[in-house]
Amino acid sequence: MVYTATPLEKKVTVNTLRKMKADKEKFITVALYDAPMAAMAQKCGVEVVLIGDSLGMTVLGYDSTVPVTMEQMIYHIEAVARGNSRSLIIGDLPFMTYATVEQTMINATRVMQAGAHMVKMEGGAWLVDSVRMLSERGIPVCAHLGLTPQSVNKFGGFRVQGRSEEQGEQIIADALALEEAGADLLVLECIPAELGARVTQALSIPTIGIGAGIGTDAQVLVINDILGLTEFPPKFSKNFLLEAKDIPGALQKYAADVKSGVFPGPEQQF
């Protein structure tokens, strides 16, 4: 069946995404940062919008996400929330704003009050206490495993994670621990496609992949990559504007290719 992107008719919730996973229906995620793009995403049927700390590199000109501040995140979350009333909106907690449980509570509250419906944090089992605390207090959580860009200095660069059997098993163990603690979604970034599929099958919560293969429940790309604005695009990305006449067309093409299983192709996987 050919998928045709249509505007979202109802507000997307965590339950919407759980049902889509159960029905084996892929959902669309786009990382973007302003009201006009947020409104366009809603019109193009994008179920999930992520305001990522990737804005440090895509919007602010930093060479990593490490310098991004809470104030910068709040500014862009508020802008996106004003432009989109139906997609599920996820807001990132930036570098070192969730190092302790108390700090996590304070900053997650700010993200939610800015208009997000869920907060995202990078890290493995060390986050379990913070995830459980937020979940028990009614704040939905999106976890993030694999290549976690805030740890780029520890990794020695933006490198694929989970290639060894030991690394892969650790990612699976962390994913299960985060789910048990109450995480509602999980982003998997830059891991082998086979591992992305294994993690997805092991969890009851939906997974969102970026460079994690075609076996995840959803895909996410940064709007800059979708529109070909990145000077040195990552392997997992694709310029969809080349196959469309305008920006809405590029978003619709991205959505259609994800829904139909065309994207990511072999050339976008590890």
Curated annotation (Swiss-Prot):
Entry-linked InterPro entries: Pantoate_hydroxy_MeTrfase, Pyrv/PenolPyrv_kinase-like_dom, Pyrv_kinase-like_dom_sf
Active site: 189
Record pathway: Cofactor biosynthesis; (R)-pantothenate biosynthesis; (R)-pantoate from 3-methyl-2-oxobutanoate: step 1/2
GO annotation (BP), single: pantothenate biosynthetic process
Localization: Cytoplasm
Named cofactor requirement(s): Mg(2+)
Pfam families given in the database record: Pantoate_transf (PF02548)
Binding site for Mg(2+): 53, 92, 122
GO MF annotation terms: 3-methyl-2-oxobutanoate hydroxymethyltransferase activity; magnesium ion binding
Cofactor binding annotation: Binds 1 Mg(2+) ion per subunit.
NCBIfam families listed in its UniProt record: panB, PRK00311.1
Function: Catalyzes the reversible reaction in which hydroxymethyl group from 5,10-methylenetetrahydrofolate is transferred onto alpha-ketoisovalerate to form ketopantoate.
Oligomeric and partner information: Homodecamer; pentamer of dimers.
Protein name, per record: 3-methyl-2-oxobutanoate hydroxymethyltransferase
